[in-house]
């Protein structure tokens, strides 16, 4: 479940920040800063026109 506050928090992050934080959460088990879910990060990528491919689908 994605909360509105998560999307508000990540809207100012760069694409590279979002990708790196997804990678760190999925591959290294590190929490995303601010307790944001990986699903919210994926949704933000889609909103920006990015295809959530590769490790983003994990």
Residue ranges and their predicted role:
Residues 33-43:
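Short, charged, amphipathic alpha-helical segments
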Residues 50-58:
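Short, charged early-sequence alpha-helical segments and their helix-coil boundaries
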Residues 1-31, 54-55:
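N-terminal acidic leader/helix
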